[in-house]
UniProtKB/Swiss-Prot annotation:
One biological process term in Gene Ontology: rRNA processing
Function: Single strand-specific metallo-endoribonuclease involved in late-stage 70S ribosome quality control and in maturation of the 3' terminus of the 16S rRNA.
Coiled coil: none
Organism, scientific name: Acinetobacter baumannii (strain AYE)
Cofactor: how and how many bound: Binds 1 zinc ion.
Superkingdom of origin organism: Bacteria
A GO cellular component annotation in the UniProt record: cytoplasm
Protein name: Endoribonuclease YbeY
Keywords tagged on the record: Cytoplasm, Endonuclease, Hydrolase, Metal-binding, Nuclease, Ribosome biogenesis, rRNA processing, Zinc
Main location: cytoplasm
NCBIfam families: rRNA maturation RNase YbeY
Cysteine disulfide partners in this protein: none
SUPFAM superfamilies hit by this protein: Metalloproteases ('zincins'), catalytic domain (SSF55486)
Length: 158
């Protein structure tokens, strides 16, 4: 499986260093865990509070910034055979929210970012935690298993 990663860092923080190789490892671990084997493309944009707030309001009608937004690709079926790699979609991650949540939850910024990246990739693959309790449990279970493979503790454990 080949992963093409587009990383746009509109907001950077010395508290959270993002390395392309590490991001690809997290994405690949997530994809392999759920049985995904195709070459793919994923975009990640790291943004500030204002942009996250605006996008969250525009696309989810929630009037506040959020940690991660997922925008699955909407490629017509007839176009897919013409592509070398499947565009899975884009993730927008708000770095200030990640840093604040990590602090509040007593986690490292790196580990919390990894969790949100796993969470976002699962959304790009069609997983959803807002449709039912069963779906939420399934998604959380997958996140815990994937993060364990990356030597990251269960993010839902107090």
């Amino acid at each position: 499986m080949k992963i093409s990663l587009s990383l746009q860092q509109d907001f950077r923080s010395p508290e959270l260093e993002l390395k392309r190789a590490q991001l690809k490892k997290i994405i690949e671990t997530t994809l392999r865990h759920v049985g995904y084997k195709e070459d793919c493309e994923i975009g990640i944009a790291c943004v500030d509070l204002e942009e996250s707030h605006q996008l969250n309001l525009q696309y989810r009608e929630k009037d506040k910034p959020t940690n991660v937004l997922s925008f699955p690709s909407d490629i017509p079926e007839e176009v897919l055979p013409m592509l070398d790699a499947l565009p899975l979609g884009d993730l927008v991650i708000c770095i200030p929210v990640v840093l604040q949540e990590a602090l509040e939850q007593k986690k490292t910024a790196q580990n919390h970012f990894a969790h949100l990246l796993v969470h976002g990739v699962l959304h790009l693959l069609g997983y959803d935690h807002e449709t039912s309790d069963e779906d939420a449990e399934e998604m959380e279970g997958l996140e815990i298993e994937i993060l364990a493979k990356l030597n990251i503790a269960n993010p839902y454990q107090e």
